[in-house]
Regions:
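N-terminal secretory signal peptides that target proteins for export/translocation
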Residues: 1-12
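Bacterial N-terminal signal peptides
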Residues: 15-29
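Glycine-biased strand-turn-strand hairpin within the trypsin-fold
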Residues: 38-88, 96-102, 109-111, 132-136, ...
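Flexible, gly/ser-rich surface segments that form the specificity/activation loops bordering the active-site cleft
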Residues: 40, 73, 94-96, 100, ...
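C-terminal recognition in membrane/secretory proteostasis and scaffolding
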Residues: 43, 47, 81-84, 92, ...
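Active-site region of chymotrypsin-like
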Residues: 51, 55, 63, 69, ...
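Conserved active-site neighborhood of the chymotrypsin/trypsin-like protease fold
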Residues: 61-62, 82-166, 199, 347-348
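Beta-strand/loop subdomains of soluble extracytoplasmic proteins
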Residues: 97-115, 149-155, 166-179, 233-236, ...
Length: 394
């Protein structure tokens, strides 16, 4: 049987006039969607701006060379953001050595006295509170979001130098790794962004999808548009830390380890090409690691995360970062499992995570203690105190 193709007039014949109408209709619909998206974006920016706070600090830093006196009173400006519980989250260095702190909301003229209730110097975060409840009228606190991925768009809000009003800059997350926080010298998870950050942005919110994903912390002065952000996992760690009313900081294993990439070293430790781990070469006394580790052990995994021969771990949602993050992402006092190899045997152990207590701290936070005896002045050393007496390079 032959099949005949249907013929005749099409169901819809597009005339020139109808084509024009259709084009106009499609164009108007696209225009309407664009206008609606623009209005939504504007409303979101206004909501975030309403939660933005300018922080004014009068500080009196100690004179480390003469600990009985201060280095004088200085004035600093920074930024902050209202979060759940009518609390203001900012950077710790914005309110360091504070004598007086006041805050002002975007679009208002009145300053309100604020109290620094918690300061997490290790992660450069602080919580401020304002007793006057009218300060928070009409504010929707920013909610914490998810950790952005590499290449994700972010927006920085704050009050940087160069003007009096709010500044909004956009960029992307260009790097996510363990980095040194200049305020404390601690090595913690850190995000790098290319959004323009300047003095005064410190403590301001980094936003993605209308949610808080970071706090602006510092910039690389030798480069343009290289800013560093305290990412949301560190913010969450800090907020959980202070739930008991005190700041414990971040735990540390307290060991030094070296990669096991040399084949001769692998053979001496009885490892094959498929094995992983890090060679422990030093264990601090009274540290977390002192309970179960000793030099010569091969640390295989911590908290269920295998340690690569390059001293990195793979963390879901974060990627490969330094192995120290396996411990530092946990709270002081928590228990984690440790897998190790010793004398050819594999061992499973549990350790209680202890706070970091360096013999010589990096930075002096607060007024230093001192003792005058027999015409001599004694005070606990810190690295910034030692640097006072280092000779400048020739």
């Amino acid at each position: 049987m032959k099949r005949a193709r249907l013929s005749g007039s099409p169901l819809l014949r597009v005339t020139p006039a109808l084509a024009v109408v259709l084009a106009l209709t499609v164009g108007l619909a696209a225009r309407s969607r664009a206008v609606a998206a623009e209005q939504d974006g504007r409303a979101e920016r206004e909501r975030i701006a309403a939660a933005l706070v300018e922080v004014y600090t009068h500080a009196s830093a100690p004179d480390l060379g003469s600990p009985w006196q201060s280095a004088g009173v200085a004035r600093y400006n920074g930024s902050g953001v209202v979060i759940e519980g009518n609390r203001i989250l900012t950077a710790a260095h914005v309110v360091a050595h504070h004598v007086e702190v006041s805050v002002k909301r975007q679009g208002t003229t009145r300053r309100h006295a604020a109290r620094v209730t918690f300061s997490g110097d290790a992660c450069d975060l602080a919580i401020l509170e304002v007793d006057d409840e009218s300060f928070f009228a009409g504010v929707k606190p920013l909610q914490l979001g998810e950790l952005p991925r590499l290449g994700d768009s972010v927006t920085a809000y704050g009050f940087p130098l160069g003007g009096e009003s709010i500044s909004i800059t956009a960029g992307i997350v260009s790097r996510l790794e363990i980095g040194v926080y200049s305020h404390s010298g601690e090595e913690l998870l850190q995000a790098q962004v290319d959004a323009a950050l300047n003095d005064g942005n410190s403590g301001g919110p980094i936003v993605a999808g209308g949610e808080l994903v970071g706090i602006a912390a510092e910039v690389l002065e030798s480069a343009e548009n290289v800013g560093y952000v305290v990412p949301v996992p560190i913010i969450e760690h800090f907020l959980r830390d202070i739930e008991d009313g005190r700041v414990d900081g971040f735990p540390n294993m307290g060991i030094d380890a070296q990669p096991i990439e040399n084949k001769a070293l692998q053979a001496s430790l009885g490892l094959t090409d498929g094995d992983h781990g890090a060679l422990v070469i030093r264990v601090d006394a009274d540290s977390t690691g002192a309970e179960v580790l000793r030099p010569g052990d091969v640390l295989l995994a911590v908290d269920g995360l295998p340690i690569g021969r390059d001293l990195t771990i793979g963390v879901p949602g974060v990627g490969r970062v330094a192995a120290s993050y396996a411990v530092r992402r946990r709270q002081v006092g928590e228990t984690v499992k440790v897998e190790l190899a010793r004398d050819g045997k594999r061992l499973d152990r549990e350790v209680v995570l202890l706070a970091t207590r360096p013999l010589v701290p990096d930075t002096q936070h607060g007024q230093p203690s001192y003792l005058v005896y027999g015409g001599l002045v004694f005070q606990p050393p810190t690295r910034d105190f030692i640097e006072l007496f280092e000779e400048p390079p020739s």
